[in-house]
Amino acid sequence: AISDICIHRGSSLSGGKILKNNCLQCPYHGWEYEKGLVKHIPGYVDSTNRNYGVPQFEIKEVNDDIFIRPTFDINSKKGNTYNHTIYVPPEAKDPNFSRISGKRHIIRPNNIISENVLDMMHISYVHSFGNSLSPVPFNMKYDDINELSGKSTFHYTAGPNSMSKIIGGANYVTVENEFYLPDVTVTRVTANNIVKTIVTHCYPIGQNESILHFDLYRNFLQSPVCDPLFHYQMKLTLDEDTQILYRIYDDYMLGFMSTKFDITQIKYR
């Protein structure tokens, strides 16, 4: 993986193409890059001594996902590395759970999107599966997992239109909200014997836009035939989330005041 910004005129390299010599060609002026270093400039004699180009990043495949370390440039050997592992939820290794995955392009900063996922108080006011008659969480508890992660546990009354109520038959659900810096959130909902866990990764692709990746694990309705149902549920949930996120004023996204129900977002910051 390399930086997307051509060093000539700043064009997006992802719009280019891979040539037969395995170089990436810039779509603007045809500069060619090999592992981030400039290999050929149209109109100039090729040189094997070129040691300039764009940053090259380490990539790693974990749990069928591709991760990039954008803080360290392999070519220049400059940047920062951090001693932490990539988080993989226990559900990923549990044969009793099925998984679906997806992504959403959202015109909002990535930190605000992740904070919304961790927000316990918005559930009943924003989401159709919430309980507007009993919207306030109870029995809340927050604990630091380590210096880079934390976890909130709380309970709330199951909404009449929620899977927890309809399928799980639960009057009350237990929710575990976790974060693992820099960008992982985990929301685990337990309703009697059924468990649904949503893991998200959110990264910026511009000043005010991001890509949210999600994995949904469940230990019920495990047949692939049921996957479209959960994809639809995630689409509806993200539609409701983005609708409210787009109504937040750009200059006031961090708000002015916080309550005890904002503990997870505050710790995440």
Report each predicted region and the residues it spans.
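Rieske [2Fe-2S] iron-sulfur-binding domain
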Residues: A1-P90
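C-terminal catalytic domain of Rieske-type non-heme iron oxygenases
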Residues: G79-R269
